[in-house]
């Protein structure tokens, strides 16, 4: 599938960040781009993949975000719970390895009825983890596809799961993970949802409360309760 090429101005608008920052990242920070004379062009898909890694890396290091930081002064409440269904929540996810957890998460995602091909979805999750782990401090991973190809899933959705056994999922300090979100969102929602979940993880008791939840219903109620915190109110 061909993805559109974005100018520097369009790329900065998509990520809600300064053009200067993106130019610096392209020249010095490894952001994929092509140069046409004095102009920089970006593949929309490569840009979103890079920004996902950048956003999660900043969560790991607790740095001030450089994306999703500036915009048009709108206020928009992004609620991940709106994209969750009970079918996509598991309080007892099976798996004792990263590969088996990814397979179980794919099976959970398939229960939403929104996947076109579960094997393609699994492969996209695997490729994203191969690129860089989505595991964060606190025992949680924000798993998402390497691509948001329109043929991967019909509509945006989020899955939540709590594994029966904490496993090493790639967290940089070697700690295990037992809570997993699968973020399968279209381009316009992908980064805002990742950003909101990151804020909920950092600024609320979401993770601890999810560990106490015993059913899918309780896990969904826990997420909705956490969303009452202003963390998901973007004032860009």
Question: Which stretches of residues belong to each language-model region?
Answer:
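Cytosolic covalent-transfer regions centered on His/Cys nucleophiles
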Residues: 1-236
């Amino acid at each position: 599938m061909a993805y559109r090429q974005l100018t520097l101005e369009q790329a900065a608008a998509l990520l809600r960040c300064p053009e200067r920052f993106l130019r610096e990242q392209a020249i010095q920070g490894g952001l994929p781009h092509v140069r046409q004379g004095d102009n920089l062009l970006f593949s929309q898909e490569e840009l979103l993949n890079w920004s996902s890694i950048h956003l999660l890396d900043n969560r790991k290091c607790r740095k001030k975000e450089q994306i999703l930081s500036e915009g048009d002064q709108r206020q928009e409440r992004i609620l991940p719970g709106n994209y969750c269904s009970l079918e996509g929540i598991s309080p007892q996810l099976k798996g004792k390895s990263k590969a088996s957890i990814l397979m179980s998460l794919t099976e959970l995602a398939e229960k939403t009825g929104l996947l076109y091909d579960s094997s393609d979805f699994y492969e996209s999750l695997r490729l994203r983890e191969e690129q860089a782990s989505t595991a964060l401090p606190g025992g949680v991973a924000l798993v998402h596809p390497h691509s948001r190809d329109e043929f991967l899933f019909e509509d945006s959705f989020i899955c939540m799961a709590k594994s029966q056994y904490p496993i090493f999922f790639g967290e940089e300090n070697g700690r295990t993970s037992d809570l997993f979100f699968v973020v399968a969102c279209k381009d316009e929602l992908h980064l805002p949802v990742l950003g909101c979940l990151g804020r909920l993880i950092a600024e609320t008791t979401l993770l601890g409360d999810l560990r106490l939840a015993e059913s899918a219903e309780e896990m969904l109620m826990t997420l909705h309760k956490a969303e009452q915190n202003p963390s998901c109110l973007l004032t860009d």
